[in-house]
Design a protein with these regions (language model features):
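Non-catalytic membrane-recruitment/adaptor modules and adjacent regulatory linkers
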Residues: 1-182
Length: 182
C-alpha cells in the first residue's frame, strides 16, 4: 500500500458518499474483474447514449458494518426507498480499471442457479478516482469486520466467500494482461 492509499478501518464506518448510480447488469461470476468489466462497459455505453436532458440518478451511498445502502436523492421532493445489500450478499467490490471513477460490486441475488444468473453487478460513478478508491477501502473494512464477527460467533454456517480488489487500476491492468475469460 502506498503512502497515498486511504486508510479506512471499521471504526471509520459508517461513511457516506454522494455518487451517481450507473445501474445494474447481470454478472457471470461471483468475484473478479473479469465479471465486472462487461457489465460496466454496457452501463457506461448506455449512460453515454442518454438524451441530453436525462441524467444519471444521484444517490447517497452509505457503507456501514452491515453492508451498503443507497437512496436516490436526485429529486428531493420525491421520497425514494433505500436499497440495501447486507455484507453477506456482496461478493466483490472494485474500482474499475478503465473507468477509474467507477466503483462496482457484485451482489449475490440467489443461492441457486434455478432463476438464471444469480449475480448482479451494481456500478456507481464517483466524483473522483480517489472517491472510488475510498469506497473500495470502506467496503474492505466492512468485509474485515464481517469476517471478525463470523470467527467470534463460532457457529456452524455455510461459508460465504467475498473479495475486495485493493489494487490500483494500474496494478489491475498489469495483472490482467494475462487474464482471459476462458
Amino acid at each position: 500500500m502506498s503512502d497515498k492509499e486511504p486508510v479506512i478501518s471499521v471504526h471509520d464506518l459508517p461513511l457516506t458518499f454522494k455518487v451517481k448510480y450507473l445501474g445494474k447488469q447481470p454478472a457471470k461470476g461471483l468475484w473478479g474483474m473479469k465479471h465486472t468489466r462487461k457489465p460496466v462497459e454496457y452501463m457506461v455505453a448506455a449512460a453515454k447514449n442518454l438524451p441530453p436532458h436525462v441524467i444519471l440518478p444521484i444517490v447517497r451511498l452509505t457503507i456501514n458494518r452491515d453492508g451498503i445502502q443507497f437512496v436516490n436523492i436526485t429529486d428531493k421532493a420525491v421520497k425514494s426507498e433505500s436499497i440495501r445489500f447486507s455484507v453477506d450478499a456482496i461478493s466483490y467490490g472494485v474500482q474499475d480499471l478503465v473507468y477509474t471513477r467507477v466503483f462496482s460490486m457484485i451482489i449475490v441475488t440467489d443461492d441457486s442457479l434455478d432463476n438464471g444468473v444469480p449475480f448482479e453487478c451494481h456500478s456507481f460513478v464517483c466524483e473522483s478516482k480517489d472517491q472510488a478508491r475510498r469506497i473500495t477501502y470502506a467496503l474492505a473494512a466492512c468485509f474485515q469486520d464481517y469476517g471478525r464477527k463470523v470467527k467470534l460467533d463460532g457457529k456452524e454456517r455455510a461459508i460465504k466467500k467475498f473479495a475486495i480488489d485493493l489494487r490500483t487500476p494500474e496494478e489491475q491492468a498489469a495483472a490482467s494482461d494475462g487474464e482471459t475469460e476462458a
